[in-house]
Amino acid sequence: KDLANQPPNVCFPAYLAEQAQSLANQYPELLTVKVLGEKDMQQLGMNCFLAVARGSAHEAKLVLLEYNGKAAKKDKNSKTKGKKSSLEEPIVLVGKGITFDSGGISLKPGLGMGEMKYDMGGAAAVMGMIKALCEARLPLQVVGALACAENMPSGTATRPGDIVTAM
């Protein structure tokens, strides 16, 4: 909730990555965070996602949060100590983190433009869920993936008809 209410001149992709790292610092035994920058994503062939961010002065980030509930079972303060999860594979949550979506060079109507900061609500929800898991210390394995970018008009923005290859 608090993340989604940040103004777009504060909440950029790097800000979301910083908030995730701050959360990991609060729960180092339960949560690890890895942040991929644009060069990392290019090497992975994530060019369709990067095309969204081409017009922005702010670098896109892919934020990966890995909640390790197995560590919670060993914690003496855990409310679920001794309980086992039947899940072998992790639960994966993906959150859209477009910190401001102007529409790029195909600008959205001005009337609702102020609301476009909420296009990162999915990323905020995933981060909130990960925080809740850390607080509850549930014996689950959960990965949160936040695709964070800003979609802005500029001379470098993706144009209609551009060909983008990916993975």
Model regions: which residues?
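N-terminal hydrophobic/helix-forming segments and targeting peptides
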Residues: 1-99, 135-136, 140
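Electropositive phosphate-/nucleotide-binding environments in soluble metabolic enzymes
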Residues: 10-17, 120-124, 157
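Alpha-helical metal-binding/catalytic segments enriched in His/Glu/Asp
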Residues: 20, 106-150
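Short acidic, glycine/serine/threonine-rich loops at helix termini
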Residues: 44-48, 102-111, 153-159
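Active-site metal-coordination/substrate-binding segment of hydrolases
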Residues: 84-124, 166
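A structural-propensity feature for long, helix-poor, extended segments
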Residues: 146-167
